[in-house]
Amino acid sequence: MRLARTIGTVTLVEPHASMRGGALRLLVPLGPADLAAGDGAAEPLVAWDDLGAGDGQLVAFSEGGEAAQPFRPADKPVDAYVAALIDRLDIAGTTGTTRHPTATRNVGKNR
C-alpha cells in the first residue's frame, strides 16, 4: 500500500456496469521526500474510490492484482484502489513532526 493525494476526478461517458457506486479519482503518489514537503511530483494515476475521497485528500491505495481483491468474487476492471482515507499523518524527523491535514471528506458526492 502507498500514499497519495487526490487531485481530481475522472468522468466516464458510459462506464462499465461494474463501475457503478463509486468514482475514478486522479491520484499523485507521494514518496518520502514528497511527504516531508507536503506535495507530490510523481506521474498521476487513476484509482477506483468507493470511500468518497475529496480533492486534496490524503489516501492510501493499492495497485495491481491486490487492487481487485476487495471485489472478489465479482470482477471489477481496476488496477488501483483507494483503500483508506487518511485523517492525519505525523512524520517524525530531525526537525520535529510534519502534519498533513487532509481535505474535508465529500461523503456521497462521488457516489
Annotate each language-model stretch with its function:
Residues A37-L45:
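Short, structured beta-strand/loop micro-motifs enriched in basic residues and often containing a Trp
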